[in-house]
Amino acid sequence: MSATKKTYSSTTSAKSKHSVRVAQTTADAALEAVYEMSGDSGDSFDYSKSVGQSAESVPAGAVTAYLQRMQREGLIQNFGCMVAVEEPNFCVIAYSENASEFLDLIPQAVPSMGEMDVLGIGTDIRTLFTPSSSAALEKAAATQDISLLNPITVHCRRSGKPLYAIAHRIDIGIVIDFEAVKMIDVPVSAAAGALQSHKLAARAITRLQALPGGDIELLCDTIVEEVRELTGYDRVMAFKFHEDEHGEVVAEIRRMDLEPYMGLHYPATDIPQASRFLLMKNRVRLIADCYASPVKLIQDPDIRQPVSLAGSTLRAPHGCHAQYMGNMGSIASLVMAVIINDNEEYSRGAIQRGRKLWGLVVCQHTSPRTVPFPLRSVCEFLMQVFGMQLNLHVELAAQLREKHILRTQTLLCDMLLRDAPIGIVSQTPNIMDLVKCDGAALYYGKRVWLLGTTPTENQIKEIADWLLEHHNDSTGLSTDSLADANYPGAHLLGDAVCGMAAAKITAKDFLFWFRSHTATEVKWGGAKHDPDEKDDGRKMHPRSSFKAFLEVVNKRSPPWEDVEMDAIHSLQLILRGSFRDIADSDTKTMIHARLNDLKLQGVEERNALANEMSRVLETAAAPILAVDSRGMINAWNAKIAQVTGLPVEEAMHCSLTKDLVLDESVVVVERLLSLALQGEEEQNVEIKLKTFGTQTTERAVILIVNACCSRDASDFVVGVFFVGQDVTEQRMFMDRFTRIQGGEKTTVQDPHPLMRPSFDGDEFGRTFKRNSALGGLKDHATGSVERLDLYLRRAEECMEVMETIPSPKFNNKQCQYLAGKLKAVLQSASLFLRISHHEHHELGASIDMGRHVEIFKLLLALAKEIESFIQGCCKDEWIKAAMTLTNVSEYVSSMGFNLELCKIAFCKSCAASGSLTLDQIEVICKDEAEVVKRNASIDVDTLFAKVIYDLTEKTLSSDQNDLAIYLLQRLKRAKPILPSFSSRPSWWNFYDDWSFSEKFFQWIQITGSLGSGSSATVEKAVWLGTPVAKKTFYGRNNEDFKREVEILAELCHPNITSMFCSPLYRRKCSIIMELMDGDLLALMQRRLDRNEDHDSPPFSILEVVDIILQTSEGMNYLHEKGIIHRDLKSMNILVKSVKVTKSEIGYVHVKVADFGLSKTKDSSTRYSNQTWNRGTNRWMAPEVINLGYESTEGEISFDGKVPKYPLKSDVYSFGMVCYEVLTGDVPFPEEKNPNNVKRMVLEGVRPDLPAHCPIELKALITDCWNQDPLKRPSFAVICQKLKYLKYLLMTGFSSYQDSYPSTEEPS
């Protein structure tokens, strides 16, 4: 069915869609009539042929009868019975023939006369059920919406048989469907029904809400998986209805032996409009057995028409549909409606206003199957959630598509300003980028410019002539079938050109977009040719549907969507304004020529000229106005009345400067008037006029005007008239460019010390527009920056969305905060990647690998922080999908560890040391690089580590110290992925290799002391050119040293301190670790010292949650590895990049450290009585203090035996750390005696949490402090709760309202 439109308004588009549905209903009725005439068996019914002929005219009466038959056929399915009753007396007015048997009214033995129950017209149905069941029915009938209480559990009075009663109201009473309650079902009461549905659907809903935004395909795949798990059907599919009402299978999960239907397209008649209407009212449709004989209804003869079964759960399938199911081997089905918002202005009725049927989720089974009503209610609830999630995805996709179109329009407009009109077809992007199409053309001045797949130039001219002849009254035309639009030359265009959108830009010029026929885009995995297939397309079957669909869409393109037509219309307006310049110029030339000929003699001649001038002014395509010597309007043509919304009669005698001009243009207009009245005419001056009437909500009207003097017969100036050009649309787009350029200029020129380095490049890759943060970096060639530019472009789009469109839960300040952090990440990426490319081109330049590593680490940390925040805080918001489109951490990680980049680094390092030539290193890396090129599935990180690993082995035994230093540094960073290699040299754990360690130790330079503890001292040092921390243990065979080295060697996490190496020199055990800025306790102390109010806490609540969240993530990683820390406290938590200012909020990087007392959970070694409970009493769990041990049942016993350390003791310590971060003080600060602290802990005493602690956090800490370790949450649970709390704080839904962190440095 073709869709041909002559206008682009949304209302007309909605009406057109309504017309399509009406026409489709007619086609449904025609197809049904053909089926009915084929006989009961339907053997003579040719499905494929009938679909093609169903569009023929059908009498209105036949359509009405068809719709009535669909709703009032008087047949139900036999897995239940139906009774219709009057209100309020419950007298039966209709019932199904099987009702007596189903309700156990037919006794097994002959009853006495007093015991016989009778069901007939007029029977009070309450007498057939127990008193409690009757009361339940009466209570349900008294409610306004009876369906909210479904199912109502009732029991037959005679047998006590339990039944589900599903009730709904119709025009003449209440229809009650009765279904059997199976023994495996768990009957739920009316009050508990909704709650039970929520519980059963909870897992599926959680999974749906956790999906990333913007991926409709993944969302559909997930819903079919969850529905199949709930219902157990053989096949579950998700159908989507397209704009032309045809359907497509977009997701499928099936039994392996069933034929796939994924990708199947089927004609709109396969699911009639009447069935779709019924699904909007009754959103879950069950067919238990398509072969079962339907049951007839018996109704009161006084009722004038059959009882409506539109809302009945038992309505029988129509014969045509039942045969279709049987042909495809689907005996039973469960169909669920997927309904989303419909923003179209035009609607068919109140029931459907604002909502539309997006598609269906369809379950099919190869044998009879009945799903109990409570489970169907669960599915219906799940579909509601799915519809809400889908609506968010659809709206996001529409926003992104509109944003892309707007950006393209902006660029096209800019091209017009520079090269009109040819720039929109000769430059990039062009008009093909505006909407999805296969080709486009510009027909202007009888010349043709072609792009992509289009008709020939002569055919374009013929189409233009046809439009001017048959559609000259419209501004454009869109159709998915030129043949159906009655274009006579359509058969000459072939399959390559079927659909067309045309926009008239002048009286005789057009823009065209073309599309090929739909079949070129349609693929179905099941549509394979089978020589043995006997189905010739006559019978109803998915294969026949697919064939019929291809026949229907033959010579037809995909339809033009409203958003695409809006984009075309917008461009049309811009172009018409641009082309109007020529007409305006002609008008101005004509007017000036007439004015210069005022030397004409004779009154009659002058009057004729005046009349002609009035006609020219009134009919001119340009806005024209005139004023007298006082500035009062005395001429106001139709065009300016149109653009301002002010009618001529209201404009006359208004003051131009006081009533019509915006304040910002008053001075300009007054100057123009003054000069013109003195005889001096100005040209090309911009003025802004007010808007009136229906135009008041729009922007000001911007005109470029020429001021012309109006003279009388004596040649005196008596007034001024203005000939203008409307440039409002162009100025809107130029203002958008100006704002973007202004932001870019601020970034480049802003001298703020916190501004990150940024620069841009020209078409040759040279740097320009550097800001002060880039310092004295010289211009250099950056190599290929296409990927980086794409990355930045995508991110800028995201930031524009965030900064300009307020979220329902995020205010503008919060969005700008996130956008600022993302911009910092991107600028760091720009610096890192461009410098790397620069050094690639200048191999002789000296390098600072430490700088590269630090920039990359900072970049990756910030990127992951933003991405993690988005995942945790924006579950159901468009903002999550918009930001995750940038794939920040994935992109940065892949670029940071790119093999090519690392290979260049090896070459530069070796060249600097002079130990190996570049050619030698190239040979070493070449094979690995070729493997990556041949097989992209190989993990680049692993390959990178392998290359370093091999190079290190080649250099350790030589005198190539510089290369060895560099390679060891890189190798230690890559070490966590190396254990997968089968062989490792002895020097790997080189703290056991004295000869090498002694040589290695010479590379460490001590620069200062950091502190000391009971088992080790920590010094500040420089190792391999990088500042590090050197931890030296007391004693030669220190168990703490070996334990810590063994644990650190297996750890790799952003919230766990990293070990570079562990050299042993002169029997001194040492660990070389990353250098941090200090511990958490010292940071809190510095914060408290700086606070003017010494009673205020050291951190804001948002910082508190961020710090303990990072700590919990590090501890969760340890526990997943089976490692117990045993000494978790603020002194053993290190921080990085801290300045002790408010601007650091959200940037405190936390890492868990000090593993000297740590132990693996599964270790068979038990601690000695002297060492097992080492730690600090204030942070010790009660079971640790009490010398408990883990029994085989997992419980803690306190009898003094030597213990295994319980895992949940770390959770208790974590609770104490939370107290520290909240208050800035140690636990139990008033108590100085350690023994008293132990006693208090064992008695269940805990520190008092401060008043500013949010309720959610207070509950979590209390759980961590629980006396019973088995009742404490795991760190995995703690992480989830803290992420959610962070979300609540950021969105303002927490019990605590903290100020949002400032991104400005305090003065």
From Swiss-Prot:
Residues 779-1003 are annotated as: Hinge. Pfam families: GAF, PAS, PAS_2, PHY, PK_Tyr_Ser-Thr. Signal peptide: none annotated. PROSITE patterns: PAC (PS50113), PAS (PS50112), PHYTOCHROME_1 (PS00245), PHYTOCHROME_2 (PS50046), PROTEIN_KINASE_ATP (PS00107), PROTEIN_KINASE_DOM (PS50011), PROTEIN_KINASE_ST (PS00108). InterPro entries: GAF, GAF-like_dom_sf, Kinase-like_dom_sf, PAS, PAS-assoc_C, PAS-like_dom_sf, PAS_2, PAS_fold. SMART domains: GAF (SM00065), PAS (SM00091), S_TKc (SM00220). One of its GO terms (cellular component) is plasma membrane. Contains one covalently linked phytochromobilin chromophore. GO terms for molecular function: ATP binding; blue light photoreceptor activity; protein serine kinase activity; protein serine/threonine kinase activity. The keyword Cell membrane applies. It catalyses: L-seryl-[protein] + ATP = O-phospho-L-seryl-[protein] + ADP + H(+); L-threonyl-[protein] + ATP = O-phospho-L-threonyl-[protein] + ADP + H(+). ATP binds at L1010, G1011, S1012, G1013, S1014, S1015, A1016, T1017, V1018, K1031. Residues 215-394 form the GAF domain. Phytochromobilin binds at C320. One of its GO terms (biological process) is regulation of DNA-templated transcription. It is an enzyme of class 2 (transferase). It comes from the Eukaryota. It is found in: Cell membrane. The active site is at D1127. Keywords: ATP-binding, Cell membrane, Chromophore, Kinase, Membrane, Nucleotide-binding, Photoreceptor protein, Receptor, Sensory transduction, Serine/threonine-protein kinase, Transcription, Transcription regulation, Transferase. Residues 609-680 form the PAS domain. Residues 1004-1307 form the Protein kinase domain. In the N-terminal section; belongs to the phytochrome family. In the C-terminal section; belongs to the protein kinase superfamily. Ser/Thr protein kinase family. Homodimer. This is Light-sensor Protein kinase. It comes from Ceratodon purpureus (Fire moss). The gene is PHY1.
